[in-house]
Amino acid sequence: MRLSRYFLPILRETPKEAEIVSHRLMLRAGMIRQEAAGIYAWLPLGLRVLNRVVEVIRAEQDRSGAIELLMPTIQSAELWRESGRYEAYGKEMLRIRDRHEREMLFGPTNEEMITAIFRSAVRSYKDLPKSLYHIQWKFRDEVRPRFGTMRSREFLMKDAYSFDLDEAGARHAYNKMFVAYLRTFARLGLKAIPMRAETGPIGGNLSHEFIILAQTGESEVYCDRAYLDFPIPPGSTDFDDVAALQATVDHWTSRYAATSEMHEPERFAAVPEEARMAARGIEVGHIFYFGTKYSEPMGARVTGPDGQERPVHMGSYGIGPSRLVAAIIEASHDEAGIVWPDAVAPFDVGLLNLKTGDIATDAACARIQEQLEAAGLSVLYDDRDERPGAKFATADLIGLPWQVIVGPKGLAEGQVELKRRATGERETVAPDALAARLRRGAAG
C-alpha cells in the first residue's frame, strides 16, 4: 500500500481531551476519530490492528474447542425479564422501543440470548459439553466514558459461553478458557496476570480478571512478583487433558493475586516483602463460572444419564478487542510513538523512500515492495514528497515493527538500511536479501 494513496489523518498536536498515552497516540496516529462521548470511528490503520487482534483471539478460541456464532446487537426485553436482570441492570443498558412499541435493548452482554439459543436446541447430556463464542459490538451507557477506547460506550467484545452437565464439567470448561486467555495475551505481546475478582452483575461464585500492569491502569492490584516469570502454556497444550489443565490453573493461582475489591491485606502481608507488588492494572479479560444462575430461571435443562432433567451449568468468558488495542499501546510505546508487537502491527514493514522522484530510489522501492509482498509481508510504502525527517517521525509514530530506509547514497553502495522499531537497532542489507532477513527476524 502506498501512503500517498492511503487514508492516514495524522495529527501533529496532541488532542487536549486525551488523558492517557494510548488515547493520545491512537488519535495522533490516525487510528480512531471520536464521533460522540465514548463512541469512536475506527479509521483504516486502527481497523487493521483491531482485525489482527481479533484474529489472535479467534485462533485461540478455536484451539480451545469453542465454536463461533454471531448474535444480534438488538435483544428482546422479554429474555432479560426471564433471567430477572431487565430491571436490575441499571442505566448502563440502552433501552429502546420498535415501531410496534415492543421493548428492546442494545445488548450490553449476551447471557440471556445464548441461553435461549441453547435451550431451543439441546435436550440431552449426550450433546454436552458445548462452548460457543461470538465477536460483536456492544453498548453500555457509561456514566463517564474516558481514556478513548479503554473505557468507551460502544466497544467490541468476544463473549464465550460454556454449557455442561455438572460443576466438574463446568470447571474444566473454565480451565480451558483460563489457559486460552493466558495464551491469547502472550501472543498479543502482553503479560497478563489472573486475579481473583468480583462477579458483579454477571453473577456466580468464581471469577478471575486478567490484568496487565500499567501506570495508567484503572484498578489497584496486589500480587506476587513471581507471576511475571511464569511460563505461558505452549501451543501443544491438550485442552482435553483434564488433569494437565487443572495443574496449569493451580500453578497460575498458587500465589497471591487480587484486585482491590478482593484484596486481603493479611494474606498479602504473608507474601515475602521482596515479592510483594502493589501496582495499577488494566483489565483485559474476565471469566466467570455462575452455575445455574441463568439456566434455572430460563429453563435451559437437559436429561441426564439417569433420565432426570436438570439445569445446565454455565460459564461466561469475555475479552474486549477494542479495549485490548489501547492496552497494548499502554504496554508498548516510547516517546516517539507506538511500538507494535509483530502479531498485531497494521503492516509488517514501513518502506521509506528518502528521495521520492529519483529514478533509482523509486525503482528500488517498487522492486522491494513487490519482493516483500510476494514473501507474504504487508508493506506500507511512504512515497510522499516529504522531508526524510517527516517520514521518520510518521514511521515511529505508527510503530510498524520494521523500517526499510532507501536513499540514493546507500543504493549507490548496493545497500538499504533496516531498522527494528522496538530496539532502534539498525543494519545495512542488500535489497534482494531483505525478504530473507525479515523472515528470519520474524521467526526470531
Curated annotation (Swiss-Prot):
Family to which this protein belongs: Belongs to the class-II aminoacyl-tRNA synthetase family. ProS type 2 subfamily.
Compartment(s) where it occurs, according to its Swiss-Prot or TrEMBL record: Cytoplasm
Gene3D superfamilies assigned to the protein according to its UniProt record, in alphabetical order: Anticodon-binding domain, Bira Bifunctional Protein, Domain 2
One of the record's GO cellular component terms: cytosol
E.C. numbers: 6.1.1.15
Catalytic reaction list: tRNA(Pro) + L-proline + ATP = L-prolyl-tRNA(Pro) + AMP + diphosphate
Protein name listed in UniProt: Proline--tRNA ligase
InterPro entries named in the record: aa-tRNA-synt_IIb, aa-tRNA-synth_II, aa-tRNA-synth_II/BPL/LPL, Anticodon-bd, Anticodon-bd_dom_sf, Pro-tRNA-ligase_IIa, Pro-tRNA-synth_IIa_bac-type, Pro-tRNA_synthetase
Subunit structure: Homodimer.
Pfam families associated with the record: HGTP_anticodon (PF03129), tRNA-synt_2b (PF00587)
A GO molecular-function annotation: ATP binding
Species in which this protein is naturally found: Methylobacterium sp. (strain 4-46)
Annotated GO biological process: prolyl-tRNA aminoacylation
Function: Catalyzes the attachment of proline to tRNA(Pro) in a two-step reaction: proline is first activated by ATP to form Pro-AMP and then transferred to the acceptor end of tRNA(Pro).
EC top class, as a word: ligase
Record keywords: Aminoacyl-tRNA synthetase, ATP-binding, Cytoplasm, Ligase, Nucleotide-binding, Protein biosynthesis
